[in-house]
Amino acid sequence: MFWSFNLSSNAALVQHLVESKFLTNQRAIKAMNATSRSFYCPLSPYMDSPQSIGYGVTISAPHMHATALQELEPVLQPGCSALDIGSGSGYLVAAMARMVAPNGTVKGIEHIPQLVETSKKNLLKDINHDEVLMEMYKEKRLQINVGDGRMGTSEDEKFDAIHVGASASELPQKLVDQLKSPGKILIPIGTYSQNIYLIEKNEQGKISKRTLFPVRYVPLTDSPDDSSDY
């Protein structure tokens, strides 16, 4: 369904995603241009395919990150709050933070403690010279924590945007409960056969679901292996 391209730079990768029509929104394009995968992916960072980041985990293919930012952009406005479940390398946390800055909040949840520590280091290298994001980090409005993504966050809080980087057999009610009205969730659902779905909650709290395309993700309930998303 998709083709892998190994590009020479982050700018070339983003341009490829634009030309491939995965990216058309200017704010999403700007966020991906500002968030270099080289900080988050040590191997072939500019190839449009999943890559190993250690601990049996892969970083999503760039076109999947582009899809997430593109679809969630209406609820990734400055001042919005976002949750990334299965935050892995920390890449999408950083990209979403650039979209909700300066007054927004982004939280990542990852169930592998060692990967949380690695992702925090990745994030700090990326935002080291970004005063706005460093201020968000210092104020704990930009953070990555160890946790069970199926349960959302431990705090009683709600989010405008929720991205789920692992598959669920069905839509977790806990995540629906943590979604604001209006709000959007991007999540892969299914077991042997999976699709990416955009879940929307309107101002009255009514839920709708739109199918985007087939994918293959590791499940939320298990430790990841090499059969990652694409």
Swiss-Prot record:
Initiates the repair of damaged proteins by catalyzing methyl esterification of L-isoaspartyl and D-aspartyl residues produced by spontaneous isomerization and racemization of L-aspartyl and L-asparaginyl residues in aging peptides and proteins. Keywords: Cytoplasm, Methyltransferase, Nucleus, S-adenosyl-L-methionine, Transferase. The active site is at 60. This is Probable protein-L-isoaspartate O-methyltransferase. It holds the Pfam family PCMT. The keyword Cytoplasm applies. S-adenosyl-L-homocysteine binds at residues 57-60, 65, 89, 110-111, 148-149, 221. Belongs to the methyltransferase superfamily. L-isoaspartyl/D-aspartyl protein methyltransferase family. It comes from the Eukaryota. NCBIfam families: pimt (TIGR00080). Its EC number is 2.1.1.77. It is an enzyme of class 2 (transferase). Its main location: cytoplasm. GO terms for molecular function: protein-L-isoaspartate (D-aspartate) O-methyltransferase activity. InterPro entries: PCMT, SAM-dependent_MTases_sf. Monomer. The keyword Transferase applies. GO terms for biological process: cellular detoxification; methylation; protein modification process; protein repair. One of its GO terms (cellular component) is cytosol. It catalyses: [protein]-L-isoaspartate + S-adenosyl-L-methionine = [protein]-L-isoaspartate alpha-methyl ester + S-adenosyl-L-homocysteine.
